[in-house]
Amino acid sequence: MTTVIDGKNVAASVIQTVKSATAALEKSSGVTTGLAVVIVGDDPASHAYVGSKGRMAKECGFKSVQHTLPADTKQEDLAALVAALNADPSIHGILVQLPLPKPLDSEAIIQSILPEKDVDGLSVVNAGKLATGDLKTGLVSCTPAGAMVFVRRTHGEDLSGLNAVVIGRSNLFGKPMAQLLLNANATVTIAHSRTKNLAEVCRNADILVAAVGRPEMVRADWVKPGATVIDVGINRVAAPERGEGKTRLVGDVAFEEVSAVASTITPVPGGVGPMTIAMLMANTVIAAHRTAGQTPPQF
């Protein structure tokens, strides 16, 4: 019987831990966890994301601050705001909603956030800490951190003897995901668009993670029977059966056929997606605990 991971349920349990840790920190050291979100311009999708992040932060008991700037904001003004938030001791996490409107240089802004407040886990310092196995002081990018929660809850903390294949080598997901699996003692292969015999490589995986943005690319005959399959892809495809011009969301994995082979699988939607905001909250409360000199919660 295949287990279909309910991402909403797992995310809710992460949020529960965040709430408890937030309340405990406030009680023990008087520190209220603070998250600042910066959004530039009026992209509706970005505003929807930021709104849901702000609501979740308040639900967790955080001090939640949103800075909304016009689309024609100058680079130096945005940089000055980030510098002010870096210097504000009541703010433990800073998130700049991407993409930024042109001609703003998002990379310069992201790298200017203090690594200890970089709750998106995008700074080169946090990437470097993950690469050297420093999970004690670094912050991990939210989507791979969320996918790793699924892996740990399925296989435990120690992945010794298990083969993991990550399809995708992006800095945002593929590389950090591979590092997390490696840190947990899995034997890791990173596959990508130039990999030969991709299906054959995937068939060796006890844990298969797909993150390339190609709809339903991973088929049943790519998957080792009994494998754990984590689908990070999110693709909108035509769904004429729903009516003219209608679409539906699918992952990088052909869910119906692969779920007949895998022992554990994440659906799209409702799998990895809900974990991203949950891990953003987790990173923020971890950052607050570190600032206060307290041991952060485990997720």
From Swiss-Prot:
One of its GO terms (biological process) is tetrahydrofolate interconversion. InterPro entries: Aminoacid_DH-like_N_sf (IPR046346), NAD(P)-bd_dom_sf (IPR036291), THF_DH/CycHdrlase (IPR000672), THF_DH/CycHdrlase_cat_dom (IPR020630), THF_DH/CycHdrlase_CS (IPR020867), THF_DH/CycHdrlase_NAD-bd_dom (IPR020631). One of its GO terms (molecular function) is methylenetetrahydrofolate dehydrogenase (NADP+) activity. Keywords: Amino-acid biosynthesis, Histidine biosynthesis, Hydrolase, Methionine biosynthesis, Multifunctional enzyme, NADP, One-carbon metabolism, Oxidoreductase, Purine biosynthesis. NADP(+) binds at residues 168-170, 193, 234. Catalyzes the oxidation of 5,10-methylenetetrahydrofolate to 5,10-methenyltetrahydrofolate and then the hydrolysis of 5,10-methenyltetrahydrofolate to 10-formyltetrahydrofolate. Homodimer. This is Bifunctional protein FolD. It comes from Rhizobium leguminosarum bv. trifolii.
